[in-house]
C-alpha cells in the first residue's frame, strides 16, 4: 500500500511539472543566423517573364551581365524579352558556416513576371549588412504553385512568383566568431521568465558547483566556462542536456485579426459570466432597369434607371450563462456553447477580459 501511494505521488508530481532539457528552453547568445540578400536574373521562363517595356531595370541588368560576358548590345536596341525576370534572392547564413557549405535560397520576383516555374537563377552574389559577399547562388527554381489560363479565364493554385532552390548557394566567406573567447557564455531563454531563469541557474550550480551560473535577468543566464573552443564545446554540451522542471506558463489567448483564428494554452480559465451577442447585417442590392420609348419615331430616348433596395436585419442574442471553467476542455466547451463565429468570438473574449471573466492575457496579432 505504501509503495502504491509513493508511486501515485510520484506520478502526480511528474505530471504537474514536466522536465525539459535546457537546450530546448534556451539558445546561446551570439550563436545565430545572419540574413543575406542579393539581386539577380532568372532565365528560361516559358513566356512568363517580365515585360521589359514596363520593367526597365530587367533590361539594364541583362545588358550589364552580357557586357561582363564580352557581348556588346548595340545602343538603342529595344529587346522584347519574355523569358527573363528580375528577382530578389534571400538566404540565411547559419552559425559556424564554413567555406564550401551549401545553404538554401528563396527566389522572389520583383517585376511583373507571371510565373517563375521552370526558370534558372543565374549566378547571384549574396551580401550581408556590411556589403560583403558571403555566398554565391545559382540553380533551378522549384515553384510549389501551378496555374493555367485560356480564353480570358485563369486558374491559379498557390504562389507562382516565388520559389526555392535547395542547396542553391555556396558559402564563400566565413563570419568571424567570438565563440571560445572569454570565460563566460550567456544563455538566453526563449521566453522571458524570472523563475525559469533562476531555476536553470540553480540546476547548473548543483551539477557544476556554486557560482557556475548566475541569472542576470528574466531572459539571460550567465555561465562560467573553461577557456578554449574544445573545452567550451564539451562544457556547453553537458549543460544543454541537463533537465529542469518547467513551471506552468502564463495563461494566454492569441487572436489573429486577419484570419479570425483563436489559440489558447491550457492555463486559460474562465469565471462565471453572462453573455449576449447580437448580429447586425446590412444588404444592399442595386439593379439597373432599362426604359425604352414605345414608339420608335416619337423622339424618345432610352433611359437607364437604377433601383436600389436596402435590407437591414438584426438577430437579437439572448443572454447566455457561462459557468466557471478550470480546464482547457471546459473552456472550449463553454465557448462552443455560445454558437459564435470566430470573428464574434474575438469580440466576446475582449469583452470577457474587460469584465474580468477571462483569466488570461489577450494578445492580438
UniProtKB/Swiss-Prot annotation:
GO terms for biological process: bacterial-type flagellum-dependent cell motility. GO terms for cellular component: bacterial-type flagellum basal body, distal rod, P ring; outer membrane-bounded periplasmic space. GO terms for molecular function: structural molecule activity. Residues 1-19 form the signal peptide. The keyword ATP-binding does not apply. Pfam families: FlgI (PF02119). InterPro entries: Flag_FlgI. Keywords: Bacterial flagellum, Periplasm, Signal. It is found in: Periplasm; Bacterial flagellum basal body. The basal body constitutes a major portion of the flagellar organelle and consists of four rings (L,P,S, and M) mounted on a central rod. Assembles around the rod to form the L-ring and probably protects the motor/basal body from shearing forces during rotation. NCBIfam families: PRK05303.1 (NF003676). Belongs to the FlgI family. This is Flagellar P-ring protein.
